[in-house]
Amino acid sequence: MPALLKRLLFQVGPHPNERTFTLSSVSTDGHYISLRPFVKPSGDELSFPFEWAFAGTNETVKVNDQGNGVVTQDFNFWLDTNVYLNVPNTHRGEVNTTWKNWDSGCVEETGAVYPFGADKESVSFRELWQPVDPSREDLVIVSPNNEKFSSNARSIVLKVTDEAYDGLVIVIGRWIQXVFVPKE
């Protein structure tokens, strides 16, 4: 079943700080996109008002069900705006994450990145995600009491690789997200 997730919390270090309106889409067959636009961009952020945007196919993520509502996902993003824009001190390569379902219906993601290089100290992060109903136009919370959710929403994926761009478009129910990166 496809999924649409709204990020509620982002935390690096001891203090949470959510400055974006982040939505992530996952297709039925495991392709994914995460768009993270700033709510109030300022300064240099105005030229590219996204904290980050990335996408990948089901070939760029390894998923393992650990049982009891815990899943590990190891991502190696196919498209990554931090790489494309050559943003300093950002992670390159596989990101190992653990996802845990909460009784509230939210999903906690934890992991670590290596923004200063794989041989340097890691930086731990935590994100809290709220599933939303992709068949609705509004952001409608899914499964607040952790009951089984079913939807008639379908997913469509378009992957673009041509001489000018690499890109991925995912349609989840009534929602669409896309990332396109020009080739150099």
Curated annotation (Swiss-Prot):
Keywords: Cytoplasm, Nucleus, Phosphoprotein. The modification Phosphoserine is found at S143. One of its GO terms (cellular component) is nucleus. It comes from the Eukaryota. It is found in: Cytoplasm; Nucleus. Pfam families: HRI1 (PF16815). InterPro entries: Hri1 (IPR031818), Hri1_N (IPR038744), Hri1_N_sf (IPR043047). Belongs to the HRI1 family. Interacts with HRR25. May interact with SEC72. This is Protein HRI1. The lineage of its organism: Eukaryota, Fungi, Dikarya, Ascomycota, Saccharomycotina. The gene is HRI1.
